[in-house]
Structures are given as C-alpha cells and as structure tokens.
Amino acid sequence: MVSKVFMVALMLFAATAGAESSHYTGIKAVPDIKVDFQFYRVSGPDVASLARQMTNAGTARANGHIGMASYQLSWQLQTRPEAQRCELEQVRVTTRIKVMVPNWMDKARASAAERQKWDKLVAAMFDYESRHKDILLESVSQLGIQLAQLSVERDCAALEYQAWQRGQGVLASSRQRFSQLQQQTDHGRKLGLNWPKGI
C-alpha cells in the first residue's frame, strides 16, 4: 500500500515537473503611495458663518464640496521580450491621494460650544474622506497582486493589454465601492456631516 501511494506521488511529480506555469510567479509588486492632506482657510465667528463661507471656498478649492478626496492610480510593467514568451520582471503601482479639508482660522476665539460643533464636523469629514482613501489603498493592494500573477503571454503588447484590463476592472470595482459608501452614508451625513443639502 505504501509503495502504491509513493508511486502515485512520484508519477504526479514527474507529470508536473516539466509543465510550464500558465501564470507568472515570484514577481515583485512595488507600491508607490503618497497621501497629501491639504487645508484651505475659512474664517468666521461661528459654524453657521463658516458653512456659508465654505459654500464659496469649497466650490473654488474642492470642486464644489466642503471636503474632497481625489486620487490617481496608475501601473507599469517592467517586461523583457524573449524567444518563447514575454518575461515579466516587475510591477509598479503608483497612487496619489489628495485629501482637502477646511481649516478654521478663528477657532480659538469661538465659544466652546461652537468649537465642539466644528470638531465633530471635521472628525466626520476626516472619517468620510478616509474611508475613500482606505477603499483606494485596498484596490492598490488588490491590483498589485493581480498584476504580479498575470497569465503568461508570448507578446509583451498582449501582456500590457491584459494588465490594462485588470486595472480597468479594479478601477470599476473602486468606483462601485465609492458609490456604495456615498449611498450608505448619505454622502457623509450619517457619519455626522450634517450640513444643509445645498452645501
């Protein structure tokens, strides 16, 4: 009985030893991630006056929003054409995230109640924008893994196209998750971003 099991294992090894993998293996995925927090200045005696000012300042500085998280995601394959196939040597995934939020310049002169209101709003804003950032960082990780395990191609242009398809799939998934987050939180209002609907 033992010898039969050993023979089966030996035959399986012999059958797979010469087989070439259909996917690239051992590829290093190099993430290049930078997060930039930016603040735009707002002034006023209380949160209500800030809300009015941020409608205009936010429109000018944050694409019509009080706060904003924007991103860029790109990828690059380092390849080498060989006689039998395109060799994939390295994958680089580059991400740039910019988070923009208001900074209340007169906060120290405001009442304790107004400062507390502001702190709650800013905390909710950071929570909401950070959730967008976290979705993107998960997508970067997922994309790096997928690109490092692409199917082997004979032609490097075909490999680049395969990577482009994977990247588009990850981007579409990210956009869907962003949309779900916006719906689930009512654009952050359920987290405490309780501004008037027009802002």
Which positions does each model-derived feature cover?
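Membrane-interfacial alpha-helical segments at the cytosolic side of multi-pass membrane proteins
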Residues: L137-L147
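Sec-dependent signal peptide recognition
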Residues: V2-V8
